[in-house]
Amino acid sequence: MNKWSRLYVITVRRTFPGRRNIVLTQYWNKSKKMSDESNDVKWNDALTPLQLMVLRDKATERPNTGAYLHTNESGVYHCANCDRPLYSSKAKFDARCGWPAFYEEVSPGAITYHRDNSLMPARVEICCARCGGHLGHVFEGEGWKQLLNLPKDTRHCVNSASLNLKKD
């Protein structure tokens, strides 16, 4: 198998005001994906193909398409695969990035952090601590604490496909 057959491509089109469409492409290596056999992870049979791609294969849903992007309902967001509580709706804020954003997880240890070198500069990937499902990425020092008067200057950029909201 050559190196090109091992690469997968996700293409996202974004329109910027006054400019042509810019195609942003993310490449990742097949070996970075989670195998079905690894770590005794059981994948929920009720997951949609998109949820499987995001949680297991570390894909990213298209921006501004997620079910929870504009949701303001009170509750706790759980992992779509293993049902572990991950984020409180109280920690959700509008970062206008195209994905739901949270400034902290529901409790310490709910998520794990991993270095992601798939794009430059390197990012920090966030995963469910129980099943290892890919949630998204975390960004620090963007100024949200001062801009929106948040307790932390952290943005957890999370795919809606990796979450289920359990309303209060």
From Swiss-Prot:
One of its GO terms (cellular component) is mitochondrion. Its EC number is 1.8.4.12. It comes from the Eukaryota. GO terms for molecular function: metal ion binding; peptide-methionine (R)-S-oxide reductase activity. It is an enzyme of class 1 (oxidoreductase). Keywords: Disulfide bond, Electron transport, Metal-binding, Oxidoreductase, Redox-active center, Transport, Zinc. GO terms for biological process: cellular response to oxidative stress; protein repair. NCBIfam families: peptide-methionine (R)-S-oxide reductase MsrB. This is Peptide methionine sulfoxide reductase 2. It comes from Saccharomyces cerevisiae (strain ATCC 204508 / S288c). The lineage of its organism: Eukaryota, Fungi, Dikarya, Ascomycota, Saccharomycotina.
